[in-house]
Amino acid sequence: MRTPTFPATFCLVAGLCLASACGGSSGPGSVGRVAEAPDPAQAIDAALDAGTPAELREGLAAAIVIDVSGSMNDRVRGEDGRRTRKIEVARRAARDLIEQFVGYAEKHPGEPVMLGVYEFSRRSGQPDLRPIVQMGPPDRAGADEAIARLQPDGGTPIGQAMLAATQALNATGLTRRHLLIVSDGENTDGYTPEDVAAAVGRRPEGERPSIYLVTFDIEARRFSPLKDAGGLVLSAGNARELNQTLDTLITGSILVE
């Protein structure tokens, strides 16, 4: 595996994570909201135990989690230098990521490959983590329409999203797991990202997803506790940096030939 390199403006802090919302329900890999308990570590461990299949098999599974909280309506510098809404930048990035996974799966027909793409935010009456593309073999069919419907609103439950996405990865039974989160804000609701990352680190080696958090237009140093819990935190301040960071992660750490 080759070691990824990043632009100097990015902040690399080590380990696992990428940001979004939600806890899970009682079913394996379900996408929903986990009831918060006085002891977060115990509750998160129990949620992860409930979603782990009995048998593991070789293969690649990835969950891409995209922040759609209200601040994603704000603007950053786009690829063309104009001020562009963050959600529009995220939509384009999501389409590109799906294409990369489709291409990888086509080149490796004998390797099990599964991809799920999710949005997250805290909204009344909705789960924190919501599927854009259900976990399964990479497929571009219908993805464009689903991505086009992404709309910013609500809070930023990054830890809850991480937990629910990890449950979805657990349900695949595949041993090479990656959780990629893109968020432009700090955690506002539910479990903290560092509590979830710490729980992931307690899992058996074959059940631990690598977690990558890309902080979009927010300082990576705000996620120092996540770094201390074993996360890899990367910073991107505009559309070009975001695309470069995601491409380097995908080709250097996730879809490794």
Place the predicted regions along the sequence by residue.
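Short beta-strand-loop
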Residues: 74-75, 104-146, 168-172, 190-194, ...
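Bacterial N-terminal signal peptides
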Residues: 9-20
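Von Willebrand factor
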Residues: 32-35, 47, 55-182, 218, ...
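VWA/integrin I-like adhesion module and closely mimicked acidic/polar interface patches used
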Residues: 149-155, 185-249
